[in-house]
């Protein structure tokens, strides 16, 4: 579709002001496992007008939990400071994922804007990220993640699309309390 849409811009069917991209996880843009470093990825990077990457340390709190939780040197902290330290590491993980994509694109000697097209934190969950899982989901952690990410992206002039404004209850049809329905900053209940 990227090539098709770029051709439509060349033909004047679409305005040249429309930016064309593909939006996917930072790993898919070459920021993680080297198995993604392929000729096809290089061709995609060359074809898009900008890269739109996703970074979700919220999911990593369960699936790749090395960064998550209280470090030994933080065990004597007050609970609030423990949480703030953990959430700072979550934001730093997003930053490192972004920088890994930048480094990969630079290694190809390609110059493209790189935006964070999706990043967010769920406020609630009753399975993997709730009380019986990583304990990542709650409103305070969501607020801290947004604050830390905004500070970093503003300081570095990086476009960040925070996912998302409103909870989407329809996303968890079989489990209304699941995390995917609770990424919104505003609860519609």
Language-model features: where?
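Noncatalytic carbohydrate-binding groove/subsite architecture in carbohydrate-active enzymes
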Residues: 1-115, 122, 126
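Short beta-strand segments at enzyme active-site cores
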Residues: 114-118, 161-164
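Aromatic-rich peripheral "rim/lid" segments of glycoside hydrolase catalytic domains that contact
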Residues: 126-189
């Amino acid at each position: 579709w990227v090539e098709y849409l770029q051709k439509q811009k060349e033909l004047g069917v679409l305005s040249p002001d429309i930016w064309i991209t593909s939006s996917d996880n930072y790993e898919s843009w070459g920021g993680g496992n080297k198995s993604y470093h392929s000729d096809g990825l290089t061709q995609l990077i060359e074809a898009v007008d900008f890269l739109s990457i996703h970074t979700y340390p919220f999911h990593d709190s369960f699936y790749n939990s090395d960064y998550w939780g209280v470090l030994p040197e933080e065990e004597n902290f007050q609970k609030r400071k423990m949480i703030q330290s953990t959430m700072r590491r979550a934001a730093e993980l997003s930053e490192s994922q972004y920088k890994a994509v930048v480094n990969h694109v630079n290694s190809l000697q390609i110059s493209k804007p790189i935006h964070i097209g999706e990043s967010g934190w769920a406020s609630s969950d009753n399975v993997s990220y709730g009380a019986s899982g990583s304990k990542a989901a709650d409103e305070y952690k969501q607020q801290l993640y947004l604050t830390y990410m905004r500070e970093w992206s503003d300081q570095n002039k990086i476009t960040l699309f925070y996912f998302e404004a409103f909870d989407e209850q329809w996303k968890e049809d079989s489990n209304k309390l699941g995390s995917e329905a609770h990424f919104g900053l505003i609860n519609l209940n």
